Amino acid sequence: MSSKNKGKVILYLMRHGQTILNKANRTQGWCDGVLTKEGIEVAVNASLGLSDIKFKAAYSSDLGRAIKTARIVIKENKASTNLKLKELEGLREVYFGKYEGEHESIMFNDIMKFLNVSSFKEADEKYDFQKEYCNSCAILDETKEAEDYNSVMKRVMKSLNDICMANSHDNGGKVLIVVHGGIIRLIIDYLDKNFNVRNMDNSSISKIICENGSFKVESVNDNSYSDKGKAMKRVMK
């Protein structure tokens, strides 16, 4: 393959649709809730908003909620041909060990106590919080199965690099990647500390450009595709 045919790869990182565990404010890493009715509706809206984008490839984590969302996008897409979903274990959400399925407030209260802070604001000021919440969870987990920051980032960034390498030929292109809120936050925070990653809505899009082995964050938590799709549905009625 000639290097002159390599081009930039634009990654469309999409968070999966809302699940029953999201709605119940339960910690959801490798445990896997089904999409709610609202989750499916918003995923369809975002998919319609993305329907005129020609994707070179489509990927998701191997967890059901991401696969279901990705299949909705592929079904609604009109611009791409023969788009087949590739499921990657390396794109899974963080594994939270004993906190899987637990109420989110319990996990984060434990982490706040461990870090000796009283609020997320204080945690952000004192720590690289995206990194330390992950490490704290791993330390607090008596099962010793929860993932620490380095373990997560190693598998996730390897997956992203592999995806970029696989799709940079023939002048690159646009790639759909349906993953998880925690993973998107970690990726964005790792690549560029200037973005606020606190909010990461279900079915939102965060865009990253990969060129010559380097990553650049272009946008984060973009809901305009969902808004566009919702407007398209009104017109179709």
Language-model-detected regions and their locations in the chain:
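Short glycine-rich phosphate-binding loop at a beta-alpha junction
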Residues: K56-D62, N171-V178
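A mid-sequence, solvent-exposed acidic-amphipathic segment
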Residues: D141-D170
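Active-site glycine-centered loops adjacent to acidic/histidine catalytic or metal-binding residues
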Residues: H16, E89, H180
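Active-site-proximal alpha-helix that buttresses catalytic centers in soluble enzyme cores
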Residues: K6-V9, M14-S80
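Short glycine/proline- and acidic residue-enriched helix-loop micro-motifs
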Residues: K113-S151
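Acidic, low-complexity terminal tails and accessory targeting/binding regions
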Residues: S2-V9, V94-I106, L115, M165-G173, ...
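Short active-site segment of divalent metal-dependent hydrolases/proteases
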Residues: T19, I183-I184
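Phosphate-coordination/substrate-recognition cap region in phosphate-metabolizing enzymes
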Residues: S47-D124
